[in-house]
Every structure is written in C-alpha cells, then in structure tokens.
C-alpha cells in the first residue's frame, strides 16, 4: 500500500471537495475552510488551521500535505524585479516577480523546457522534459506570495496579476493548467480577476479550442511573424496550425470571453532584419484587421549563441508608427530585470535532457544558454 501523501495544492475547489468526501469522509465546507487557510493565509501546517477540529487535523496530517516548490535561488534587479529559481522535483523552473506603480505581475512557468523549437527561444534549445503538476504551477504563485509577504511586511506590492508566460507552452499542459487557473480565480484561492490572469500561447489550436467556453481569462498570442513562410521558419508549430487556423481559433475564444473585452493581445518579438521591416509592419496590420487586438512589440533580448540581434531604436520606432497608421493600439514592452537575466527571453531553467543545450553551449564557447519567458 502506498504511503505517499496527497498534496492538497493539486486540487481546485471541486477536486478538493471530492477528496474530502471520498478520502476523509468530510463535508464540503471543511474543504473550503482548508482551501482558505492555504491560499488566503499561506498556511502549510495543519496545526495552524485554528478553526479545524483536532480530529480532522490529525486525519489531514496522516493522509495529506501542502507542498509548494521551494526557492533554490533568488536574484534581485535594481528595478525591483525578482527572479526565483524554484525547485520542482530534481529540477528548477523560474518565476519572475515584476512590480510596477499600480500592480505587481508574476510570470509563471507551465513546463520544464519546451517542445515547440521556436528559433529565437533558448528554452526550446534546451528541449522538453515534462509538464508541471497543478501543485507546481499554482505552487509558484503560493511560494511567491509568501516571499513577497502576504501582509506587506516586506514593503513589496502584493501580486495582482499572473501571466502564464514562463518556461513552456501552457496549452500543451491543459490537464494541469485548467485547475491551476481555477485556483487563481477562485475566491477561496487567490481571488484574482479574470482580466488579471493571462495565458499566452504560441498557437496550439486544439488547446485553445478546449479552453473556449471552459475557462475565461485574458489571452495573449505569440505571433512573431506576419506570414506563414516566415513564421514557419522561426516557429515550426506553424506547420501544424498556420496563421489563419490560429487566428480563427483566437476569434472563437474572444467571442466567448468577457475577460478579453473583445480583444486579444498580440505578442511580436522584433528580430533585427528578420521580421522588423516596414513591409512586415504593413503586412501585420493587414493580417490583424479582422481580429480585434492590441499589439505588444518586444525588442529581442539576446542570449549567448543566439543567431538574432535586437533591432535599433529607429527600426523599432518605425515599425510601431507604421502599425499605428492603421489605427492599431501598439505598445513597446519595457525591458524589466535584464540585469539579472529575467527579461523576456532571458530566463534560465534546469532541464535534465540537455542534448540540444549542450550543442548550443559548445557553439557559444561555454557561455550559459538562457531561457525566455514567452
């Protein structure tokens, strides 16, 4: 008989209620009480749950546990950004806390590595190892909330937004993504507004269609090219689902969504003399004319061994102004945490299968390969 304890972080409210009924013989309200202790107060010791009777606390200690990823390393940027390496099993993923004047955003990983092989992404060069469990996804948020300080004792702004833009493709981990999102939104969980939780995808149409009508959060799409030829060159997933398939799926999702207010966020990494020409801007503007959107331009953050460069400021400015001629809303993402390699394109993970990474390391003459946040 297995003696492994059940990690309560692996369950959303529905799952936790079922667990309490089937494994503990307890009513739903007891599950709700425990869930509130875990997420509202950051408690991971059953003995500290003071409104739970002793008999139930003993049953919980015998059969269950509350185990989140632990911080194995923390780096602090001069701009307030914090990058945590979080230990999941025998590997690390990275989670980034980004404070601003009116919010604090947490960038969360969904996989160890990534299988999509986007050419500008060093996560892809490391290869794919495994999906994160529910407890390892929501546990990043739980741990970060503890680190930041639930009662503001650290002076840091509490987490107000979560973006699934860390290591991995979220929609290739739907089984564990959905319950984690449910906990983020649940009033007994983190109670975040659906407009403050964002899922980013590189174009996994099957996953996006699965989300449609099932869970409502903000959507960001990693587009990065205005035509299929160029997109297939830098993002091989385009050979499975081309741009028109992708955008049709996006329109289906936002039509059923309140969180997106009828618009999708388009992420577009600018690669010097690859996808950043005026002709690309015109093509992108035409491409998106039937899909209500706001376009977020991301100047490429180089990593050692990368074949791409960041465009000049003049090219970035020209690209933005060209798009704005078509009355698109266009922003340029401000680089945050680049001094600790926590900017978009610079997160460093720990992946066991390093076949691709080893080759990249040799090509970079021994320099560390870095990992992006989508």
Curated annotation (Swiss-Prot):
Under InterPro entries, the record lists: Aldolase_TIM (IPR013785), Methyltransferase_A (IPR040072), RlmN_N (IPR048641), RNA_MTrfase_RlmN (IPR027492), rRNA_lsu_MTrfase_RlmN/Cfr (IPR004383), rSAM (IPR007197)
Where does the Radical SAM core domain lie? 100-339
In short, the EC number is 2.1.1.192
Q: List the disulfide bonds.
A: 107-344
One GO biological process from the UniProt record? rRNA base methylation
Q: Which family does it belong to?
A: Belongs to the radical SAM superfamily. RlmN family.
Name used for this protein in its record: Dual-specificity RNA methyltransferase RlmN
Q: Which organism is it from?
A: Vibrio vulnificus (strain YJ016)
Q: What is the lineage of its organism?
A: Bacteria, Pseudomonadati, Pseudomonadota, Gammaproteobacteria, Vibrionales
Report the gene name.
rlmN
């Amino acid at each position: 008989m297995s003696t492994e304890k059940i990690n309560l972080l692996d369950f959303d409210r529905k799952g936790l209620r079922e667990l309490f009924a089937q494994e503990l013989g307890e009513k739903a309200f007891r599950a709700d009480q425990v869930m509130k202790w875990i997420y509202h107060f950051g408690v991971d010791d059953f003995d500290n749950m003071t409104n739970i009777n002793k008999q139930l606390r003993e049953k919980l200690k015998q059969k269950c546990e509350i185990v989140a990823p632990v911080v194995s390393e923390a780096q602090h940027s001069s701009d307030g950004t914090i990058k945590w390496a979080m230990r999941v099993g025998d590997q690390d993923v990275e989670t980034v806390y980004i404070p601003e004047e009116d919010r604090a955003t947490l960038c969360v990983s969904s996989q160890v590595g990534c299988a999509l092989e986007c050419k500008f992404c060093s996560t892809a060069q490391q290869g794919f190892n495994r999906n994160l469990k529910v407890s390892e996804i929501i546990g990043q948020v739980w741990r970060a909330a503890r680190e930041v300080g639930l009662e503001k004792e650290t002076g840091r702004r509490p987490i107000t937004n979560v973006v699934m833009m860390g290591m991995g493709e979220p929609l290739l981990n739907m089984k564990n993504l959905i319950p984690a999102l449910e906990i983020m939104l649940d009033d007994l969980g983190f109670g975040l507004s659906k407009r403050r939780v964002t899922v980013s995808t590189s174009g996994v149409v099957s996953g996006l269609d699965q989300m449609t009508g099932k869970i409502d959060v903000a959507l960001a799409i990693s587009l990065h090219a205005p035509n299929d030829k160029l997109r297939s060159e830098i993002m091989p997933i385009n050979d499975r689902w081309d741009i028109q398939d992708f955008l049709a799926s996006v329109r289906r999702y936002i039509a059923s969504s309140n969180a997106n207010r009828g618009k999708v966020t388009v992420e577009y990494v600018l690669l010097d003399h690859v996808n950043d020409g005026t002709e690309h801007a015109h093509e992108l503007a035409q491409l998106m004319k039937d899909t209500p959107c706001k376009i977020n331009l991301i100047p490429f953050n180089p990593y050692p061994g990368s074949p791409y460069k960041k465009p000049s400021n003049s090219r970035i400015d020209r690209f933005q102004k060209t798009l704005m001629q078509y009355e698109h809303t266009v922003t340029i993402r401000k680089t945050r945490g680049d001094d600790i390699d926590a900017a978009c394109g610079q997160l460093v993970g720990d992946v066991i299968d390093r076949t691709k990474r080893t080759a990249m390391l040799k090509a970079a003459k021994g320099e560390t390969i870095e990992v992006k946040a989508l």
